[in-house]
């Protein structure tokens, strides 16, 4: 049984339509010319898009070429366009076991939005950076867009 050119073209178009959803959001480094010690290979948002009735979780997968010890901070900044909305800071050791040996690393940031943040925008630019405070060294910095869906309750808007 031979597959026609039309069927191959249709299969290609369908795979192109669904492949971005399978790969997670497009992300980029904050400074495209810089080689960070922690190289990010993927970013996943769950659920994608984030539902206003729930919350979102970000999972970052990558590889570090150096040991990361205690005292490192993970910063998550939310912005609408280029206008900052909020900043959250986490100790790396609260997110993953420390010290982190060179090699693969997975970071998961749960509950990334406050109730107010879920109400006020249809999407956010998120900037996540990891900084070694004692050395003042940026170990990773990425940015990407997260979309929100669903309707915010008017009662919640009045009472919060």
From Swiss-Prot:
From the UniProt annotation, give the residues forming the signal peptide: 1-23
Pfam families linked to this entry: E1_DerP2_DerF2
Q: What is this protein called?
A: MD-2-related lipid-recognition protein ROSY1
Q: Name one GO biological process term.
A: response to salt stress
Q: Which gene encodes it?
A: ROSY1
Subunit info?
A: Interacts with SYT1.
* Keyword Transmembrane helix in record: no
One GO term in the molecular function aspect is: phosphatidylethanolamine binding
Domain of life of the organism in this record? Eukaryota
UniProt entry keywords in alphabetical sequence: Cytoplasm, Signal, Stress response
Organism phylogeny: Eukaryota, Viridiplantae, Streptophyta, Embryophyta, Tracheophyta
One GO cellular component term, please give it.
Answer: cytoplasm
Its induction note reads: Induced by gravity stimulation.
